[in-house]
Structures are given as structure tokens and as C-alpha cells.
């Protein structure tokens, strides 16, 4: 089924910044996709095209990307008479039209909007749910679908929050729940307990939420944050049933070959900055003291030696996730696999800028027996594409914020609907989240 019309506009994301929305029309109807954006972005990511005009939106406008869809992509796309059910041909066409290695001519945000809207149109063309179509084009097993474990970011630090805490995200991971809906209930109850404990201990304003819905109290150390979360898990009655995951986002505080855990202080003491090995030792202590099941971006994105050293120590105990390290880029993923630097991929569709390349990144990871965690960005929207993607890919893990803020819950609510629709044709990944593709 060919596309009769393609149109883009700008709308706003959850941080109040403009982003690209694409409407793609076929004989079956209109299919809409909105592109997310990140706060901490890896230097190896595909280029998100922003206007740079400081007099409007503080330079963050996307009118160029929108114009690229409407003036360059749309006429060529409609003329090419592409079949929406052939996703790889569509994405190949878009990449050739751009012609740069990092999508800097048209903008990854322009290309991705069209790519994702195409998949939605294809699902309608085939009269199947989006997750089913995504399973088809990614070659996933479909005897039973796997529902992901929701990694819920309940406490924010790093670049996502004020306060001194360097680590960016502390997540609860309900691995022992029997179903996705129960996992979400457990997460919600822990989250509410955490909010009330936080307000009690740090004052009313500490219960205010960060970009991704987590609380952001003025906490100084990772242990203080972990103790608070453990108390909330205990208070909710789930001791021993919920794991913890960290997204350190260490590239944000990697300076001159060292790690500055006091990076938000302009006068931080250089003598206290840690080497990669010292930081690895801190992680090992935390892994031994707390039920940590996954650590993302423990080191700087080009500090390969630290990653390899850490992998050799703990890869049998915890999942080591590459985000800034791998940026959903096949070349970076290949290097990380060869070097034995990580054992899981954080999959963000806007880091690579097309659906086909995102699926390829997941497949390469699965082939290396890596885990794959499908992820939102901190600048999110009401679009629920990644919920269907996590199910269609059989990823077994999704990271989409706290059980708060509608742009986060939109994804979690969509998985609830998918769970209901699939009934006994679905299983919850639970403790097998790392190897869900094999279930």
C-alpha cells in the first residue's frame, strides 16, 4: 500500500521543547508518529536537527527538520510509490535521500518520524496490531509473546535532577511478579511509599518529580539513595521480590580520564576524583550490598579499558548495559561485543534514527547472547511506539520512567492493553529478562 500524503509539524515534548510529529496517509487512514529527544546524549548518536536560532525556543526549534520532511522527503516519498509493509526498503530510501553517515542532512528526527509512522501504517495494512507487525519484520518467535519487565526510574540524580547525587537513575525491577500488570502494581506501590518516605526525610519539596517521574531529593551518595529505595520496597511488602537497576550515565562526569562524583559542584575537589578501577570497586561493593540486577553506562563512553575490566569482574552477576557506549549503533555494538565490554544494549530508536537499523541493533545483540532493554528518552511524548516494540522484539525489558507522568504511563498502559489482548498467548519475562529472546 503506497503513501498518498506525508506531512510534518512541530509539537511539544514532555520538557516543553519542540519535536517533530509526522502524519502519514494511505488508503487505510492517517498514521501519526512523534519523535522523542534525550537530555544526556552520546557523542556517537545520529544527529537530531535543531534550528540553533537562540531567539526562538532557546535554539531548540525543529522547523528545519519539519521543513525537510515537508519539502524534501514528502515529494520524493510519495513519488517513489513505496510499499509501507516493506520497512527496510522505506528506511533504505530515507537513508539514501539523506546520504550522510549520521543523518545530519535531513536530521535523524525527521527521518525517524517517517520511519515509525510507516510501521504503524503497515500494521493497519496487514490488519494486525503494531507489536505483531514488528515481530514479523524482526523475525521474532511468535508462539508466545514476551511482556517486558518494567524498569521504573523512581529516584533521579545526575543531569536529570538537582542535588549532589552523580548517578542519574535508580530503578526498581519487579522480577518476581507473575504478570506485567502485577509488576506495575508492585512498582506503583513502592513508588508511593518512596514518595512519602522522601517527603518525611527531606521535606515536602523533595517529593517533586524529575523529568522521568522519579523523586529527586537532595541526596549526596548512591548508598543513601539505595537505602531509601530499600526502605520503600520493605514498606510496600516486597522485600526480596524487587531488584534494583542503576543508570549511572558516567560520561556526564568523566573528566580528564577520571570520574568526578561531585560534578555538579563547580569547586569539586580534584583529589577525590576516581579512576575507572576505583569506580569499579565502588560498584562491586554496591552489588554485594544491594539486590542490583543491572548497571547501565557505568563508565565514560570511550573509556573502553574500564568497561572491559568491569565486565571481567561482574558480568556473571549483573547485566552491564551500554547506552552512551553503544548508542544503538551497529559498529559500536560490534566493538563492544568483540572487546567483551558489556552484555546488554539500551535500544533507543532516535539514537540511530530508523526502525530497520534499530531492529538490526537488537538482532546483533541477541546473536551475541546480549540482553536488550527498549528505552524512552527524557524528552518524551504521548506516542506509545516503544511499548509495541518491546513486545514485538521480545526484548523482555523496557525502561520508560516512573509510574507517574502521562508520557511515561502511556507506554506502560499500552503494554497493559497488549497483555489483556494476548491473554495466555503472552508470558511475563520476570527473572529471565536478560535472555527473554530465548524464552
Swiss-Prot record:
This is Enolase 2. The gene is ENO2. CDD domains: enolase. It comes from the Eukaryota. Belongs to the enolase family. One of its GO terms (cellular component) is phosphopyruvate hydratase complex. Homodimer. Mg(2+) binds at residues 247, 296, 323. The active site is at 212 (proton donor), 348 (proton acceptor).
